[in-house]
From Swiss-Prot:
Catalyzed reactions: L-seryl-[protein] + ATP = O-phospho-L-seryl-[protein] + ADP + H(+); L-threonyl-[protein] + ATP = O-phospho-L-threonyl-[protein] + ADP + H(+)
Biased composition (Acidic residues): 760-771
Compartment(s) where it occurs, according to its Swiss-Prot or TrEMBL record: Cytoplasm; Nucleus
Keywords assigned: Acetylation, ATP-binding, Cell cycle, Cell division, Coiled coil, Cytoplasm, Disease variant, Kinase, Magnesium, Metal-binding, Mitosis, Nucleotide-binding, Nucleus, Phosphoprotein, Repeat, Serine/threonine-protein kinase, Transferase
Database matches in Pfam families: Pkinase, WD40_RLD
Primary localisation category: cytoplasm
Disease link: Lethal congenital contracture syndrome 10: A form of lethal congenital contracture syndrome, an autosomal recessive disorder characterized by degeneration of anterior horn neurons, extreme skeletal muscle atrophy and congenital non-progressive joint contractures. The contractures can involve the upper or lower limbs and/or the vertebral column, leading to various degrees of flexion or extension limitations evident at birth.
Gene3D superfamilies associated with the record: Phosphorylase Kinase, domain 1 (3.30.200.20), Regulator of chromosome condensation 1/beta-lactamase-inhibitor protein II (2.130.10.30), Transferase(Phosphotransferase) domain 1 (1.10.510.10)
RCC1 repeat coordinates: 388-444, 445-498, 499-550, 551-615, 616-668, 669-726
Protein name: Serine/threonine-protein kinase Nek9
Native organism: Homo sapiens (Human)
Record's GO cellular component terms: cytosol; nucleus
Length: 979
């Protein structure tokens, strides 16, 4: 029984290390299988679906590619590192899996964030954080011999050292720190990546000895082939900072040999310009490049140097602030295994209006440079791409004098989308267009404005002149980051991350909500009741809306045609109705007519407004002269209109209002238009009836011909711009489908796993870097590797690979075929003496799996094996004495006897296992029978008790209409009179 238990224990250990989905070895008993089934099913039912849309390929390598994806749940950008495992060697495969292990351990603002990994057939997909600023290598090349400012170098140095400190505290040696592996965001936030060569050490005194890394950044100890530790990473950091200071590689040569010589001798390519940089910074870099590893500082010691210590808190706060917009929480556990749904879509931007009734597709903005947000102004358009770049151009009708609202540094009329180069390096999250100006918000919450400052919409008290031709930052919000911005024709309103509202610009009709009609040229804080949490701001041409978390709407400004929804209809006692009109309001007032709905989106136009509630229903109010309310007529409407008709039963997801027209998109991928169709406003030629000089339609009419999903939509004046997407195909990828779970991989790489030494030092061995692993993960347990190498040669394992009687599993057979050759001992006695006490604990597994294979191998291999192992043969004398080595004649027969004995033990164990399974089945059957009898007895007892109680009650109070026989028929047989 103990032998069988050890056998099963060892199989479980191997299966767990190799990611086996079975709970144990061999045939599972009914109990465990039954218990695993519901658990697996329950896990599958709870799996989260994550939806991704591919954007473009960032780069290709020999074994895969990196692709940019947009995750639709939070509209974030991620990178999928796709690795074709079939094209990798076993070492390269382990490196890929090792990167997952390392990244899963690390969580730091200056380290590339790992989100998930998936398996698509034989392709490993690693989901990582996207850095939109390229890498440090390209950043240095773009300098073109213009040295960095010391402040920028110190900023980079602090972030790099902070990341290295984090990985070293986790016991991880990076081993490939270089400028190509240091990534940047557009806000100059450093992200240290590429952990494929990283290694986990047991302690700060542990050493490694495998030759890995990039030659230009190798430390002297690596070049000399001696053991190295965390100080090797510090050397690489010194090389990177030296490169930042000189824009040249620290060590350079024409061939690797000369390069190693220069590294060992400390012959640098050039020296740092001491007139450009402080002595303290230069000395810090030189200390990292000390030839003696012991003299190099640790990462924590570098952070404690005065140059970094005096600004450490300030830079830490800056890193946290810059990282906040893109920071995404990790899953609570690594075992949740979500499902990835990858949907390929075409993404296009269309514009119409201004005399063009046919939608015009923009070729500049398309897949690969797709749009995430669009905005229309009276004279121009603006688009933010998925990579957070801003494009602007004039609208189609043109002819209007520009005031710099395009932000290109001039007043030229660019009729095609043009990238605003002055914002290069800034990640633009949102843009809003006014009449002749533009305001945008970055990921960091900073505000940039450009265009006309006639009404003070630049927010800088008119100090920049009447026109601003290039994006200008509003320093007012440096310490109070902005969440959202909205522009009217001549005013601006913003919502900060602290949920505060600020407004400035033209104050006519009280549109700023500041209790006056004064114009303000700098941002002014708006008083909002503290009980209300504002979640969105939206400006009309001469009014403003605030949307609260509870779905309430506050409005201020001009309420002409009741377009703010502020008018009240009151009923008297004797059917007398009074209609109270509010012409305008200078402070934010609750729109009571909208209080019956929980509003989620509001879209003001020039004369009317549309809103979407939490149920996807569309509401309209305001002027209905051209049928823009979509109610099927052109009559004046006093209140709020809940749209039915063509939109009845549909969920509206996007809506926008222009000058006397409305465009809406539904969740079933339809686009509707209604209202004034003049000058191409509706992208169609309505035939309902002429209305004055314009062509109008009062019912929502479908446009665009085919089904399109609309991520964003904007109307202003006569113009409309929208993003349309069509699904090409969709694919579902289930995470960890082949057992490549993080827990599995890390279990094998942990100190207790395969290959780890026990003396406090963990060393890279040649076997670790070259021994193949057919499982796709790391090797198995240390006991299994030792035992197999000591008892079976690859030749013998191959000889039995096709045998019908072999019980060796396929994965184990492949392991044996690729195992290192170790000679076979000559006789049973040395064989048994070769095992230590710890190895004897797992001997049954070796006997069951290994020796059975060895016993059936061709015997002609045995003399060669024995002749090659004089160390284990007591009959062979020392080679140094010159005595010829002759194998004993009885060795083969002795070994055969030992093998036969072990075969008998195998059969005995298997028979015992089968017997135990049969006994378990019998016991289970008996228990079921006993349970049934027990339940039957309990039911009879309860029934008898109830009958006896009823009989006693009958005797005490007999019913006159029932005789004793009929009463007894309601009970059990025990109450019948005996015949």
């Amino acid at each position: 029984m103990s032998v069988l238990g050890e056998y099963e224990r060892h199989c479980d250990s191997i299966n767990s290390d190799f990611g086996s989905e079975s709970g144990g070895c061999g045939d599972s008993s009914p109990g465990p299988s039954a218990s695993q089934g519901p658990r697996a099913g329950g896990g599958a039912a709870e799996q989260e679906e994550l939806h991704y849309i591919p954007i473009r390929v960032l780069g290709r390598g020999a074994f895969g590619e990196a692709t940019l994806y947009r995750r639709t749940e939070d509209d974030s950008l991620v990178v999928w590192k796709e690795v074709d495992l079939t094209r990798l060697s076993e070492k390269e495969r382990r490196d890929a899996l090792n990167e997952i292990v390392i990244l899963a351990l690390l969580q730091h603002d200056n380290i590339i964030a790992y989100y998930n990994h998936f398996m698509d057939n034989t392709t490993l997909l690693i989901e990582l954080e996207y850095c939109n600023g390229g890498n440090l290598y390209d950043k240095i090349l773009r300098q073109k011999d213009k040295l960095f400012e010391e402040e920028m170098v110190v900023w980079y140095l602090f972030q790099i050292v902070s990341a290295v400190s984090c990985i070293h505290k986790a016991g991880i040696l990076h081993r490939d720190i270089k400028t190509l592996n240091i990534f940047l965001t557009k806000a100059n936030l450093i992200k240290l990546g590429d952990y494929g060569l990283a290694k986990k050490l047991n302690s700060e005194y542990s050493m490694a000895e495998t030759l890995v890394g990039t030659p230009y950044y190798m430390s002297p100890e690596l070049c000399q082939g001696v053991k190295y530790n965390f100080k090797s990473d510090i050397w690489a950091v010194g090389c990177v900072i030296f490169e930042l200071l000189t824009l040249k590689r620290t060590f350079d040569a024409t061939n690797p040999l000369n390069l190693c010589v220069k590294i060992v001798q400390g012959i640098r390519a050039m020296e740092v310009d001491s007139s450009q940089y402080s002595l303290e910074l230069i000395q810090m870099v030189h200390s990292c490049l000390d030839q003696d590893p012991e003299q190099r500082p640790t990462a924590d010691e570098l952070l404690d140097r005065p140059l970094l210590r005096k600004r450490r808190r300030e830079m830490e706060e800056k890193v946290t602030l810059l990282n906040a917009p893109t920071k995404r929480p990790r899953s609570s556990t690594v075992t949740e295994a979500p499902i990835a749904v990858v949907t390929s879509r075409t993404s296009e931007v269309y514009v119409w209006g201004g005399g063009k009734s046919t939608p015009q597709k923009l070729d500049v903005i398309k897949s690969g440079c797709s749009a995430r947000q669009v905005c229309a102004g009276n004279t121009h358009f603006a688009v933010v791409t998925v990579e957070k770049e801003l494009y602007t151009w004039v609208n189609m009708q043109g002819g209007t004098k520009l005031h710099g609202q395009l932000g290109h540094g001039d007043k030229a009329s660019y009729r095609q989308p043009k990238h605003v180069e002055k914002l290069q390096g800034k990640a633009i999250r949102q843009v809003s267009c006014g009449d002749d100006f533009t305001v945008c918000v970055t990921d960091e919450g900073q505000l940039y404005a450009f265009g006309s400052d006639y009404y003070g919409c630049m927010g800088v008290d008119k100090v920049a002149g009447p026109e601003v031709l290039e994006p200008m930052q509003l320093n007012f919000f440096l310490s109070n980051p902005v969440e959202q911005v909205s522009c009217g024709d001549n005013h601006v309103v913003v919502l900060t991350r602290n949920k505060e509202v600020y407004s400035w610009g033209c104050g006519e009709y009280g549109r700023l909500g500041l209790d006056s009609e004064e114009d303000y040229y700098t941002p002014q804080k708006v008083d909002v009741p503290k009980a209300l949490i504002i979640v969105a701001v939206q400006c009309g041409c001469d009014g403003t809306f605030l949307l609260t978390q509870s779905g309430k709407v506050l409005a201020c400004g001009l309420n002409e045609f009741n377009k703010l929804g502020l008018n009240q209809c009151m009923s008297g006692i004797i059917n007398h109705e009074a209609y109270h009109e509010v012409p305008y309001t200078t402070s934010f007032t609750l729109a009571k007519q909208l209080s019956f709905y929980k509003i989620r989106t509001i879209a003001p136009g020039k004369t009317h407004t549309a809103a979407i509630d939490e149920r996807g229903r569309l509401l309209t109010f305001g002027c209905n002269k051209c049928g823009q309310l979509g109610v099927g007529n052109y009559k004046k409407r006093l209140g709020i209109n809940l749209l039915g008709g063509p939109l009845g039963g549909k969920q509206v997801i996007r809506v926008s209002c222009g000058d006397e027209f409305t465009i809406a998109a539904t969740d079933d991928n339809h686009i509707f238009a209604w209202g004034n169709g003049g000058n191409g406003r509706l992208a169609m030629t309505p035939t309902e009836r002429p209305h004055g000089s314009d062509i109008c339609t009062s019912w929502p009419r479908p446009i665009f011909g085919s089904l399109h999903h609309v991520p964003d939509l904007s109307c202003r004046g006569w113009h409309t711009i929208l993003i349309v997407e069509k699904v090409l195909n969709s694919k579902t990828i289930r995470s960890n489908s082949s057992g490549l779970s993080i827990g599995t991989v890390f279990q094998s790489s942990s100190p207790g796993g395969g290959g780890g030494g026990g003396g406090g030092e963990e060393e890279d061995s040649q076997q670790e870097s070259e021994t193949p692993d057919p499982s796709g993960g790391f090797r198995g347990t240390m006991e299994a590797d030792r035992g197999m190498e000591g008892l079976i040669s690859p030749t013998e394992a191959m000889g039995n690979s096709n045998g019908a009687s072999s019980s060796c599993p396929g994965w184990l057979r492949k392991e044996l075929e690729n195992a290192e050759f170790i000679p076979m001992p000559d006789s049973p006695s040395p064989l048994s003496a070769a095992f230590s006490e710890s190895e004897k604990d797992t001997l049954p597994y070796e006997e069951l799996q290994g020796l059975k294979v060895a016993s059936e191998a061709p015997l002609e291999h045995k003399p060669q094996v024995e002749a090659s192992s004089p160390r284990l043969n007591p009959a062979v004398t020392c080679a140094g004495k010159g005595t010829p080595l002759t194998p004993p004649a009885c060795a083969c027969s002795s070994l055969q006897v030992e093998v036969e004995r072990l075969q008998g033990l195998v059969l005995k164990c298997l028979a015992e296992q089968q017997k135990l399974q049969q006994e378990n089945l019998q016991i289970f059957t008996q228990l079921q029978k006993l349970n049934k009898k027990l339940e039957g007895g309990q039911q009879v007892g309860m029934h008898s008790k109830g009958t006896q109680t009823a009989k006693e009650e009958m005797e005490m109070d007999p019913k006159p209409d029932l005789d004793s026989d009929s009463w007894c028929l309601l009970g059990t047989d025990s109450c019948r009179p005996s015949l």
